[in-house]
């Protein structure tokens, strides 16, 4: 994936059942190359395909990479190492695979239709910069730079190379000369410049936070070259801004510039998406958009000219179904070929039907944010006491919910939100569950229990907590809330749980602030982008754009955050992130619940599925049907 014009198509696939392939990229990571600079400079070779039985090694170490961004991205992949097959693990009739780079042997075959179902995607509006959904854009569009499916190492994609100025403030991208839009017109630097301006300026943009340093509009040097002159060095320009989808100016430019937004704001909201199908460069051409159907769906045709080789299906249908039970019914009735997200409880319901179950690292975390400024809390000093927060964390039985809810498909020991494999401080762990120790810690902090076991505040009245959680979640934090509720009850604390629709929840965390714990999960982008969730200047009580909903303030953390977002050297950024992780593990702006695995169901007659920690449906063009 580090060639100037990479090809990850059929010629490079190693094909049969999902196995323990040690791919080119995994070889680089496991082989200990010191980082992305070494990765990009690696010399190439060719791998020899091997045939192996499907495998799953649940205890196998995951590949990591220590990123050091090279100014120029070029080079050839390192050769692949051979993998030794291990015994296949199964859950009922499901064959389990946990390799980040599965191995397949055989010959891909073309088929008619691939069907994919996912929950929680809003297909009511296809504005590509609002990102109300995500899967549809991975089908139609491509980014400038590709992030490796596990390590997140950046590599050329639509751009054949990128260069960084000596002062670290200017980025120049050279586009491949063989990229065509679905209408046959060439991709140009004008399209790239337009896309980045939209992401920066559209009031609907979900990723405007990646572009505050792009105060100047991009410079189109010539048709294949575009330059971005930033106002300062950036810690996430390559990993986040450069990984956004490129939009066609010809299709969207006139509408955007006409200013259809409030007070004449330029926006892509309201574009006639039902009449005009999105035009991209990606593996699938959109041919139908039916947001009013039950369920809502999109239909695609294969892009025969896709630069990474055409998909192995003539068409693809993508549906979104919010109810988990309905999604499982569709799977059991063979109405879908892939299903994600899937919980461990879901697996119990479908394990007697043949299929592949991929258990893959998710670029995600789970927590309950702590509200330090709940005006309705009768004991506001309670959660503001760090000793109390640490006591509550010690009193949470994480292994209990790991076994009961996740069946082990989670690393509940992980602390914080830095779920990047290259940046997480592996020395940090959540405390081991110890109810007696937690009770003693609360007592030492001045909180005693009465004869009935209720924990009393310093005013002699029982301590109670109010928790909020969304009614739809990517990961089952609503069930974690129930588990934590029982743990806190053992400490003498009653916690009420309110399950809310998204609009009501947003009003509670952004405007009324009348809660104590917000149970939460989130999928991350490739680079650190949590500045507004932690920095004290981004408290939504004073900053409408802020996401520091609990009003946490830590001066040392603020200083580190200001350094992290301006540090382009990822080795140095990793060191800063390590310090930051130590702070949030100790000072606890949240109770941390670990990093979940993604579970993806794939029909037994499908091969070629490549997990992607950034979005598990991103590599859909690699899949084929065996029969």
Name what the model sees in each region.
Residues 1-22, 26-42:
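N-terminal secretory signal peptides
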Residues 33-40, 295-297, 302-304, 359-362, ...:
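Detector for C-terminal structural segments
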Residues 94-102, 114-166, 197, 279-285, ...:
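N-terminal lobe/hinge region of extracytoplasmic solute-binding protein
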Residues 99-105, 118-135, 158, 185, ...:
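A structural "hinge/loop" feature
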Residues 115, 188-195, 223-229, 283, ...:
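Alpha-helical secondary-structure segments
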Residues 122, 148-153, 245-310, 315, ...:
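Gly/Pro-rich hinge or "lid" segments in bacterial periplasmic/extracellular proteins
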Residues 176, 272, 302-349, 481-486, ...:
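Ligand-site clamp/hinge motif
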Residues 209-263:
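Surface-exposed binding/hinge segments that line
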